[in-house]
Amino acid sequence: MTELSKPLRRTLVGRVVSDKMQKTVTVLVERQVKHPVIGKYVGQSKKYHAHDEAGTYKMGDTVEIAESKPISRTKSWVVTRLVEASKGI
């Protein structure tokens, strides 16, 4: 019999741009995509709402988020780890 394995979850790395909600942070993920006709690399960005149970991540932190089952209407990502803490002034 074959062993059922857990499906791989997509992971993204981005910057926390808002931590004003309870147990939720907004993460901005920026990517470089090659334009199909011109061939030039163009910057694209997208914001994701990610679950932060303890509320430990602050604005400016670089975090890794992973896809999960839907937690709410707009939230289907979970913060998995801190990549780099924000540089406080």
Curated annotation (Swiss-Prot):
Keywords: Ribonucleoprotein, Ribosomal protein, RNA-binding, rRNA-binding. GO terms for molecular function: rRNA binding; structural constituent of ribosome. InterPro entries: NA-bd_OB-fold (IPR012340), Ribosomal_uS17 (IPR000266), Ribosomal_uS17_bact/chlr (IPR019984), Ribosomal_uS17_CS (IPR019979). Signal peptide: none annotated. One of its GO terms (biological process) is translation. Pfam families: Ribosomal_S17. GO terms for cellular component: cytosolic small ribosomal subunit. The keyword Ribosomal protein applies. The keyword rRNA-binding applies. Part of the 30S ribosomal subunit. One of the primary rRNA binding proteins, it binds specifically to the 5'-end of 16S ribosomal RNA. PANTHER family: 40S RIBOSOMAL PROTEIN S11 FAMILY MEMBER, SMALL RIBOSOMAL SUBUNIT PROTEIN US17M. Belongs to the universal ribosomal protein uS17 family. This is Small ribosomal subunit protein uS17. The gene is rpsQ.
